[in-house]
A protein has these predicted regions:
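Conserved alpha/beta-domain cores
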Residues: 1-107, 115, 129
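C-terminal helical cap(s) of enzyme catalytic domains, especially alpha/beta-barrels
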Residues: 113-135
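Conserved active-site alpha-helix within GNAT-family acetyltransferase domains
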Residues: 110
Length: 135
């Protein structure tokens, strides 16, 4: 979830269904226009909004850092997300349980684990490159 609009839409649908929906908030740590996610400075107002809801529970953060060949830069981005994760957990928001930090994909999952990820997405490393010609 990367916006207040989406968060409130999920709240509305979860209320209709009579459930509490677990979500992750997505952070666009590199400020890339090609990626979704809230800018890091917008995470706090998004958490404030989430904490005021009755049918949403924030379970953590997710992020995809910019693709680059600079291992040190990649780790800096991942470390920044980890610091946001820790700070969000320390703030004691209602309905916020920072348990999951989803960052790292096939190309950088080792760095992500070193920097605190609890969930990595490594489909390409397991299954290989996608063949888009078969559509």
């Amino acid at each position: 979830v990367d916006s207040e609009h989406l968060l409130l839409a999920i709240e509305k649908e979860a209320a209709k269904a009579g459930i509490v929906q677990d979500i992750l908030l997505e952070v666009n740590i590199g400020g890339e226009e090609s990626k979704t996610g809230a800018a890091p400075e917008l995470l706090w107002p998004l958490l404030d909004t989430a904490a005021a809801q009755q049918h949403i529970r924030v379970k953590g953060l997710m992020a995809i850092p910019p693709v680059n060949d600079d291992d040190a830069q990649n780790r800096r981005y991942l470390a920044q997300v980890y610091q946001l994760f820790v700070r969000a957990g320390e703030r004691g928001y209602r309905n916020v349980e920072m348990q999951t930090l989803s960052m790292g994909m096939s190309g950088d999952f080792e760095n992500a684990i070193r920097e605190g990820a609890t969930l990595v997405r490594i489909g390409t490393a397991i299954y290989g490159e996608r063949d888009y010609s078969k559509k």
